[in-house]
Amino acid sequence: MARRGQQPPPQQQQAPPTQKNQAGKFNPAEFVKPGLTEEEVLEIKEAFDLFDTDGTQSIDPKELKAAMTSLGFEAKNQTIYQMISDLDTDGSGQIDFAEFLKLMTARISERDSKADIQKVFNLFDSERAGVITLKDLRKVAKELGETMDDSELQEMIDRADSDGDAQVTFEDFYNIMTKKTFA
């Protein structure tokens, strides 16, 4: 309490509500978008805070490398500096939470997409040999009730097979599945 004739202590200013709401708490709802839940935003914020070791509400290249590595992503120096260059909209040389969220959302969706494609590949690779063969395609076509002759199935393999060994590796399969147009 202020004594008579004394001014009360000045109120501390709060950070603008870009990452915190009026009560000073982080509001994940501000960052939710299609394909990203509040829970995922909070998990990414926890990672951001964990690696914002100096508490500046931004992550520098050294902190970003540690964050990406801990989340299971490859983090070469050249990649890190390229990420910062691509995402650093304010030219600070660092990434704030909104920029970090954009990066992680892209990486998560890339990782999830690859995992989903791996599951589909495994459905075709019935012998778990790490490749899809004519025999595998024949079996899947039969299970799906498709009537395709071996020449049609072989043509499918030939289109996807990058090294001409008459087998489709996961890499071949992934490339076909993520291709925007088919020749």
Curated annotation (Swiss-Prot):
It is found in: Cytoplasm, Cytoskeleton. Ca(2+) 2 binds at D88, D90, S92, Q94, E99. One of its GO terms (molecular function) is calcium ion binding. Transmembrane segments: none annotated. Residues 39-74, 75-110, 112-147, 148-183 form the EF-hand domain. It comes from the Eukaryota. Ca(2+) 1 binds at D52, D54, T56, S58, E63. Belongs to the centrin family. PANTHER family: EF-HAND SUPERFAMILY PROTEIN, MYOSIN LIGHT CHAIN 1, 3. Plays a fundamental role in microtubule organizing center structure and function. Component of the infraciliary lattice (ICL) and the ciliary basal bodies. This is Caltractin ICL1c. It comes from Paramecium tetraurelia. The lineage of its organism: Eukaryota, Sar, Alveolata, Ciliophora, Intramacronucleata.
